[in-house]
């Protein structure tokens, strides 16, 4: 599942490999990551990078309190899509934001409602629209 997601991603197309983020020999971080997840992301997608986060601060980009789970890059760009018997979360590896509209159409978990389980996809769509009208992916167009 994760491998299939990954080979269709822009990361794969740009030569990023599994080992760019993961260490097969194990680390102190979850999922055998080489560094904390958001630190890995910011290595390439920092504030001065043309590829993101497109806001002065992470909190402004995510609309979640700084240092909260919702402000982590993987919360939106690698949402949890399954859980194994060993209580291991399986995350999407397309690195694309799955909008609530995509969730409705494709019947896949979206980045908002994976955490906001008490809310509807309509609530999530309205929240995204209130954040910006500049980015079509945020409003699911």
Where are the language model's segments positioned?
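Inter-heme linker and motif-flanking segments adjacent to c-type heme-binding CXXCH motifs
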Residues: 1-134
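Extended alpha-helical interface modules used as scaffolds for assembling large macromolecular complexes
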Residues: 135-141
């Amino acid at each position: 599942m994760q491998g299939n997601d990954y080979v269709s991603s822009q990361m794969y197309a740009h030569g990023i490999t599994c080992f760019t983020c993961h260490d097969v020999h194990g680390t102190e971080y979850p999922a055998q990551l080489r560094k904390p997840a958001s630190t890995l992301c910011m290595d390439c997608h920092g504030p001065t990078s043309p590829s993101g986060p497109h806001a002065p601060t992470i909190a402004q980009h995510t609309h979640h309190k700084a240092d909260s789970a919702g402000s982590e890059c993987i919360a939106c760009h690698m949402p949890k899509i399954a859980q194994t018997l060993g209580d291991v979360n399986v995350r999407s590896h397309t690195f694309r934001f799955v909008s609530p509209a995509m969730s409705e159409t494709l019947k896949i978990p979206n980045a908002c409602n994976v955490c906001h389980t008490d809310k509807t996809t309509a609530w999530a769509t309205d929240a995204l629209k209130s954040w910006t009208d500049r980015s079509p992916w945020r409003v699911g167009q």
